[in-house]
Amino acid sequence: MIGELDTLETGKWRLRFTRDLAHPIERAWQALTEPEQLQAWFPQRIVGDLLTPGAPLRFEHTGVDMPAFEGRVLAVEPPSLLEFLWGTDTLRFELAKAEGGCTLTLMDTIGELGRAARDGAGWHACLDVLEAALDGRAATLTAGDRWQEVHKEYIDAFGPEAATIGPPEELRS
């Protein structure tokens, strides 16, 4: 399922993704907050305490020579809400109990419309890898390969003005 793009009154944009997960909310919470589980699906290594509001965070790229960037935990309500600054973006993860597991909603507030298709495809791919990890199976594609598959869908859905910024650095040839 493709993500959605909304324009906010603040002049920013919000990417929204919803996934139904066949796992208890507590298991999904672990995947969102425990460093060893984040490594399986989150695009950077997170250094810092995700469970403490106000805590500083550092996001380090692995396998790519790119500078790290900073963030800060904004809100934590285990096991249903995690929100933090991710560089200039605000990432908000919400979990809700649902029949057969839980529902994950990821919202990424971005300040530049031209990033929407790129970032939308990126989060789509990361969430695919997260689902596979939760299911205990290997993802059929890496997040980068999955990004290549779904990027055009996001350009088509969000429009060319949402695709003025190219692929992530690690996918450039």
What are these regions (language model features)?
Residues 4, 57-59, 66-68, 99, ...:
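Charge-dense, helix-prone N-terminal extensions
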Residues 12, 64-66, 88-90:
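Glycine-centered tight beta-turn/hairpin loop motif at sheet-sheet or coil-to-beta transitions
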Residues 1-45, 170-173:
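Hydrophobic ligand-binding cavity/cleft-lining segments
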Residues 6-12, 50-53, 75-77, 96-99:
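Short, ordered beta-strand-loop transition motifs
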Residues 110-171:
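A conserved amphipathic terminal alpha-helix motif
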Residues 26, 80, 102:
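Glycine-centered loop/turn positions within well-structured domains
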Residues 74, 83-134:
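Beta-strand/loop substructures that line and gate deep hydrophobic ligand-binding cavities in soluble
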